[in-house]
Amino acid sequence: MKRTPLYERHVALGAKMVDFAGWIMPLYYSSIFEEVMAVRKSVGVFDVSHMGEIVVEGQETVDFVNFLVTNDFSAIPEGKAMYTVMCNETGGIVDDLVVYRISHEKAIMVVNAANIEKDYEWIKVHAKNFNVEVRNVSDETALVAFQGPKSQETLQRVVDIDLEGIGYYSFQWGRLDGERVLVSRTGYTGEDGFELMMNAESAAKIWDTLVEIAGNVDGKPAGLGARDVCRLEASYLLYGQDMDESTNPFEVGLSWVVKMNKDFVGKEALLKLKEKVERKLVALELSGRRIARKGYTVLKEGKEVGKITSGNFSPTLGKSIALALVSRCVKTGDRLEVVFPGKNVEAHVVKKPFYRGSVRREA
């Protein structure tokens, strides 16, 4: 299994280590509950260095990225990032990603850990007709998320840039412990927070500083368990669970990242799919504390209407919650049943997100 540059730090902190997409990663350090609460009330520090970073560089960078993704990359200025998806020719989602516009001739695409090789090959194939160079810099890059309502005031003590001046989905280059870092106001928790991109050799030093300053405000390192709970509470999607190449953006609530005023891979298919959306991703609150697993059947009036895509117990809400891909006939407020081994459990369709935290929504 692959290790991030922070593997030794996780072991030293006593983390429970697990396999995630071929990486050995911390599931939790103390407990998932405590780590979720730290993120919600103070700050959590996450190693997300398993994510992939692919650099696109050259005169046609903006045109190329814009052709590759569904959102309008040409509309954002330098110093901004953008959430988007890449689709295949049939409209299926190849991956969801965040793209940073470094300059007119350089972009960094941050992709899911399980998809690094697939995405890299996909991007290279489509780059052949453009004046760009594509490089996979994942192994030499580290990524740490610093998330929670106290993230700005805490991080400000150790960086040389004004964090208040970094808007939502914006970034600046700065220094932390003398090391160069890209600091973006992005995250996957539903709270205000930052993600710090750096050279892999700088990661351990920076991690130690971040864990120390988090501890000063009752924050703590947080593992993949807390990350998954936080993203589900915020109704953020996970590739491979809530979407994949068998789903299109309209089915999973991502129509807002599809801009039809430009050309891109999969556009023709999506124009047709938009006219006949038969499924949708909904939020469910379940009775009791049992966790609905991916693939569990969802019933409405005894008839199957879909499947669970993600489920977990929410410590923030004190409820079992889930996302499900269901027939478009399902409406908010509907009473459904989820088929567990041995019994059916009642569930209600609620509005997304389950939880709205301190995340900044302004541009």
Curated annotation (Swiss-Prot):
EC numbers on record: 2.1.2.10
Keyword 4Fe-4S: no
Pfam family, one: GCV_T
A GO biological process held by the record: glycine decarboxylation via glycine cleavage system
Catalytic activity line of the entry: N(6)-[(R)-S(8)-aminomethyldihydrolipoyl]-L-lysyl-[protein] + (6S)-5,6,7,8-tetrahydrofolate = N(6)-[(R)-dihydrolipoyl]-L-lysyl-[protein] + (6R)-5,10-methylene-5,6,7,8-tetrahydrofolate + NH4(+)
Keyword vocabulary terms for this entry: Aminotransferase, Transferase
GO molecular function (one): transaminase activity
One GO cellular component term noted in the UniProt record for this chain: cytosol
Quaternary context: The glycine cleavage system is composed of four proteins: P, T, L and H.
Function: The glycine cleavage system catalyzes the degradation of glycine.
NCBIfam families on file: gcvT, PRK00389.1
Similarity-based family: Belongs to the GcvT family.
Name of the molecule in the record: Aminomethyltransferase
Provenance organism: Thermotoga neapolitana (strain ATCC 49049 / DSM 4359 / NBRC 107923 / NS-E)
Gene name in the database record: gcvT
